[in-house]
Regions:
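Alpha-helical membrane-targeting segments
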Residues: 160, 175-184, 217-254
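Rossmann-fold NAD(P)H-dependent dehydrogenase/reductase core
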Residues: 2-219, 307-309
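C-terminal amphipathic/interface module of NAD(P)-dependent oxidoreductases
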Residues: 284-309
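Short aromatic-enriched loop/helix-cap "lid" or pocket-rim segments at secondary-structure transitions
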Residues: 150-154, 222-227, 285-286
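A generic structural signal for short coil/turn motifs at secondary-structure boundaries
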Residues: 101-102, 282-285
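C-terminal helical subdomain
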Residues: 239-281, 290-292, 302
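A generic "alpha-helical surface" signal
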Residues: 46, 73, 253, 291-294
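Active-site oxyanion-binding pockets that recognize sulfate/phosphate
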Residues: 107, 184-187, 245, 286, ...
Length: 309
C-alpha cells in the first residue's frame, strides 16, 4: 500500500527513510522534506499518515509505504513498491532500529532485533541499489556500542559486538562474555554488522556513496520502547534536557541534521563513519578489518539466499 501525494514534481529529488514516525527518524524525515520528496517506510499506517500530513502541512511532499522492517517478505514488497513509484531517488536512510528488552522472533523465525537492525536494511538496500543513480547516498544509522573499547558504551553496560556468524545471530546467539543487559548483545552485534556492511558496500559499489552515522545517545528516542514506563518517562522528559551539553549525547533534532548532511553530501565521500557532531570517527578495531567486513556481507547473503521470502 502506498499513499502518493498530489502535484508531485518529477524534478524533485526523493529520499527514502525507514523508521520515520518517531525520534531521530521523524526529525530526519522533516529535514529531508525541505530538500525533496520523502518516502516514509514504516509499519504503522496511522503514524505514517501523521508524519506525512505534517510534511505536507509545511508545503513538502511525502509518500507512505507500509513495511515491517523485521519481516523480510514485507521488506521485499516495500522495495518493489518504492521502485514502482518511479521517483527520482537520490538517497536512502536506514534508520529503523530496536533495542529489545526481551528476545522475540520475526516472521521468518529469526531474532527480531537482528532482523530489524541488520537483515531488513541489508535486503532493502540491495534491492534498491540497482535503481539508485550514480552518486546517490546511502546512510546507515549505526551505534558506537559495537566497540568494546568505547568508554560511554562500556559504562552503560555494553560489551561490544558479539558476532559469531550470520546464522548464529539470526538464532539469537552471541559470543560468550557479553553484556548482562537484556538485548544489549543483539543490538551491539547488529549495529556492528551495519557498520561492516557500509564499509564493504563502499568498496564493492563505488558508483554509490555508503556512509554511517553514530547519532549519539538521545534519551528521547524510541529505541527502548520495550522499557518500562518510568524509564521511558525519564528518558523523554528528564535526561533529554541535558543531552546537548554532554559529550557523546545528542538530541533527535541535532542527529537529524547530521544524517541529512550525510545524505545530501555531494562531495563524493564514501565509507565514512560520522559521530554525533558530524565529524569522522573510527569504529571498533574488529569492524575496521576488511576481511571481517567481507565475511559479514558474505554470510548475510548466504543466509538470505537460503530463506524463502
Amino acid at each position: 500500500m502506498s499513499n502518493t501525494v498530489n502535484e508531485y514534481s518529477t524534478e524533485r529529488k526523493a529520499f527514502i527513510i525507514t523508521g520515520p514516525t518517531s525520534g531521530i527518524g521523524r526529525c530526519t524525515a522533516l529535514e529531508l522534506a525541505r530538500h525533496g520528496t520523502v518516502v516514509l517506510v514504516g509499519r504503522d499506517p496511522r503514524k505514517l499518515y501523521l508524519v506525512q500530513k505534517t510534511i505536507e502541512g509545511k508545503g513538502g511532499h511525502a509518500v507512505s509505504v507500509i513495511c515491517d522492517v523485521s519481516d523480510l517478505t514485507s521488506v521485499r514488497h516495500a522495495a518493489a513498491e518504492i521502485i514502482a513509484l518511479k521517483l527520482p531517488l537520490a538517497g536512502l536512510v536506514n534508520n529503523a532500529g530496536v533495542l529489545a528488552m526481551q528476545a522475540t522472533k520475526n516472521a521468518q523465525g529469526w531474532d527480531t532485533a537482528f532482523a530489524t537492525n541488520h537483515l531488513g536494511p541489508f535486503v532493502l538496500t540491495e534491492a534498491l541499489m540497482p535503481h539508485l543513480p550514480d552518486g546517490a547516498n546511502v546512510v546507515f544509522v549505526c551505534s558506537g556500542v559495537e566497540d568494546p573499547e568505547r568508554r560511554p558504551a562500556v559504562v552503560a553496560g555494553f560489551r561490544g559486538g558479539r558476532y559469531i556468524s550470520a546464522e548464529a545471530s539470526a538464532r539469537g546467539e552471541w559470543k560468550s562474555g557479553g553484556s548482562t543487559l537484556p538485548g544489549a548483545d543483539a543490538y551491539a552485534t547488529s549495529k556492528q554488522c551495519n557498520l561492516a556492511t557500509v564499509t564493504a558496500f563502499a568498496r564493492e559499489t563505488p558508483r554509490l556513496r555508503f556512509n554511517a552515522v553514530e547519532p549519539g545517545f538521545s534519551p528521547a528516542t524510541g529505541l527502548g520502547r520495550d522499557a518500562n514506563v518510568f524509564v521511558r518517562f525519564l528518558g523523554k522528559h528528564v535526561l533529554s534536557l541535558f543531552a546537548p551539553y554532554i559529550k557523546y549525547w545528542s538530541t533527535p533534532e541535532r542527529a537529524a541534521k547530521v544524517i541529512t548532511n550525510a545524505v545530501l553530501n555531494g562531495a563524493g565521500v564514501t565509507g565514512i563513519y560520522y559521530d554525533e557532531r558530524g565529524k569522522p570517527m573510527l569504529g571498533s578495531e574488529q569492524v575496521r578489518d576488511p576481511k571481517f567486513q567481507d565475511r559479514i556481507v558474505a554470510e548475510t547473503r548466504a543466509l538470505l539466499a537460503k530463506t524463502p521470502m
